[in-house]
Amino acid sequence: KTEKDHNENVRAIQKEILKNGPVTCGYQVFDNHYDDSGFSSTGSYYDTKGDYLFSHAVSIIGWGTEQVNNISIPYWLCRNSFGSSYMNAGYFKMKRGSNFCLIESDVWAAEPFAVYESDL
């Protein structure tokens, strides 16, 4: 994909979250993610170290930007399935906009529909 294609994909993910809520994504887990040594004190994961271990799925619930060493880093806000004892009450941040750990390549969204009592 070109950078333009990738930027359009990021915008599509953001639009989907705004319109219908969280999306599910798969991403690559490396040693320093699995043992938590790659996370900053704010629960941010921006650098891989070690071997690729496996793929994992989380929900992307939002996005933002934070300052790290006077550098503005865009991130996805992710909700893990490990429960509230993981990271920041079950949430963590992953670098946004660079397809970090392939997080922006493997995204799914459900199509919402309404069920009415008269349909039951």
Kindly give the residue locations of the regions a language model identified.
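Predominantly the structural core of cysteine protease catalytic domains
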Residues: 1-77, 84-120
